[in-house]
Amino acid sequence: MNTFPKLNTIRNELKSVLDSDVIPLELTSLNRNRSIAKNPFLFEVTLNNTGQKNNGIEAFDPVTNQLPINLGSINSLNTGQILLEWTGLDINVTGTISSINDNEIIITFTSAFNNQYNYYRGLISVFSTGTWAHIIEYVFLGNNLGLFRFENLPSTLPTIGSSVTITFNGLLTSSGSNIFSVFIPKTMEHNALSGLLLYNETLNENKMISTYSSQRAEALISSGPVPTWTNAHTYSVRKEVPFVSSVSAAPPPTSTTVSLTPIPVGTGSPGDFIRNRSTGEIVTIVTIDNTTGAVTFSPSVNPVWVAGQTLEILTFNRDNFNYVTYSSLQREAPTGEYEATLISLNLPKERLDIDFPIEKMPFVYLEVRDTFNPSTNSFMSNNPGSKKALFKATLKSNKTDDKPFVKFSGDRAIRTLKFRPSAANFIFSILGPNGNPLMLWRQDTSSPYPPNRLLQTEAFLNIRKVSNSKYA
């Protein structure tokens, strides 16, 4: 009697049962608590069904959508936050070539210039020979020197000492068209700014961005140019526009109080924010009188704000921090062992602080553990850097594609993870070959700015409860 059909049936039924017990687990740095976890490659998440906080005072990581888009900061350049906020719509910069090395040219500026990182990325540099090249990175070196990296330099290289021109004629030269282009410095991924607002801070007016090309750092506005907008005005890109007020002279402001004029109408509550455009300081509203405009705020400021300074009233949008929510795990289940499989690990295609691109790393280690139940499971290795790793993830993405993230895989390895569903606190860490957490050259944003989604990490695992007696 042939028993193989019956055996195959049993196997299929067993596989179906096993698959039904699989619990997908997604861990992302996007919704971490940035007040205690600055690095998107190292953070904690709590397994809990508790909801988010609903105001800026109680929230762990409060966020508003009315600030300029923030791309993060680079500590080594000491340039502060990289905001999509600038003055003028046209670019006209001249200089001379000081040195050439492969696709890099150092230029000595001979006209006014901007020292913010990647301010000129996406523009075209025209050389004295009439040839040109596309700028893909700009770093200010100090002493009127700028380092420019190009996609490709012309076959006939410009000579040292020859002139260079970088120009962009935007809104002001497009008055005859219903569609006009605007240069947006410091750039983002392709079409990342579509649907956002180009905001004229000087006039408190805005236009919606139709499309955006990161390669050219150019936004198209379909509703036509505005004759009153000039190169002397300050512009920014925002998801929503703020309510604009100013510091009143009476009563005089203190380190923790200010009176607003005009008084906010229909906006401004405890937990919302105030940004001083002159100083860049952002404070949280503690109390506000919508009749008199009197506000107390935290933290204190020093020096005290000056009458007439422009203030932005920014509405609290959400608590960025989010617990790992679940429905398929039993809330009161005891500590147990779970089999874990790493399905995918996505990392930003960015430069590390060790000046090495992530997409050139052949592998990384992934640490996932419950702080209350440290796991003793690890694979055998003579590399001491693997000591804390649950998985070794190998690079799977095409290194040359234009996607902003690179994908790593656990290659179907199965590991054991111990935790208690009702009280788990996961440590999530991306480790280099030496076992130390990786860190990006560009730092993520902090509250109340939303996180820069192009700097985030994400792991997707399948977990299943281990039970020796379940199928006995």
Swiss-Prot record:
Q: Which family does it belong to?
A: Belongs to the IIV-6 198R family.
Annotated protein name in UniProt: Uncharacterized protein 198R
Name its species.
Invertebrate iridescent virus 6 (IIV-6)
Question: Which taxonomic lineage is given here?
Answer: Viruses, Varidnaviria, Bamfordvirae, Nucleocytoviricota, Megaviricetes
